[in-house]
């Protein structure tokens, strides 16, 4: 079982530790509800060092990445990040990821922890056609810390004075100094709140973590586990691999058409996307339920005539709205907000309705 550079800190802090994709990770500290509300009202600190990270370098690096991802990376500039997807030829999703353009020949990729080995092997398989492209896996050498919430930048500025929120637009990053080294600070996140994700050498993870907690204590900054990370992303309607998206899901049927550039030229899975674009059958929608029953992944969804129309992707009790919410993959004619639905939970049909995403609208990135 793998551990992050902060594992001993989490254990000493009394975090509940779970196996998450082969990593021992904190799922909660004080409690999911309290941690969630802290991020929405003040700030939260996340250890997400289990995420995979690769470098792609070389004269043809951009050309290579354009061929294996769906978004148009050529539209980015140095210092900009882009959310994108890698597809199989049949249009199923290998993974969703963020690519950071350091310069025209150097790119940094952050991928999902559970897909790290698969993703790297898949990239290696396709890199051979692009002479000079070099791939390297740095997942065991780098840590990733996320600071999220409306007070995130105020707290960060006390530890890294060089940060300037006005000079760091959404999905851009800067190299900033800390303890004689450089950190990559990106204005990205998985909560819908303002904030950053910071990539740094393992040796600096605990010093930065503790410095941020000290700087933000009076503002209500708390450590946050993977449990609240999931409820935060679900309130925003963000996809999670293995739930809203997987190897059997086409992005055009998962609310991800906006990251598929059909105009940029050839990429793996393009023809499959074109076929779905002509005749999409399914889509992902948000829903809420009456009462307090909690829908889980795989629960069947029915229409008002009790005909099965899809399955639940994710479900939780929203800490912000105090009601059961979730996402479901449904036949397209049932995606309109306000449409009545019924979710089968432990043999009983629970009434609800389709809701517009996101469920909440905090101060965005």
From Swiss-Prot:
Protein name: Aminomethyltransferase
InterPro entries named among the record's database cross-references: GCS_T (IPR006223), GCS_T_bac (IPR022903), GCST_C (IPR013977), GCV_T_N (IPR006222), GcvT/YgfZ/DmdA (IPR028896), GcvT/YgfZ_C (IPR029043), TrmE/GcvT_dom1 (IPR027266)
Keywords, alphabetical: Aminotransferase, Transferase
Gene3D superfamilies: Aminomethyltransferase beta-barrel domains, Aminomethyltransferase fragment, Probable tRNA modification gtpase trme, domain 1
GO CC term, one of those recorded: glycine cleavage complex
Role description: The glycine cleavage system catalyzes the degradation of glycine.
Domain of life: Bacteria
UniProt key word Aminoacyl-tRNA synthetase: no
UniProt GO BP: glycine decarboxylation via glycine cleavage system
GO function terms (MF aspect): aminomethyltransferase activity; transaminase activity
Family label: Belongs to the GcvT family.
Quaternary structure and partners: The glycine cleavage system is composed of four proteins: P, T, L and H.
Reaction(s) the record says it catalyses: N(6)-[(R)-S(8)-aminomethyldihydrolipoyl]-L-lysyl-[protein] + (6S)-5,6,7,8-tetrahydrofolate = N(6)-[(R)-dihydrolipoyl]-L-lysyl-[protein] + (6R)-5,10-methylene-5,6,7,8-tetrahydrofolate + NH4(+)
Cross-referenced Pfam families: GCV_T, GCV_T_C
EC numbers, comma separated: 2.1.2.10
Key word Transferase present: yes
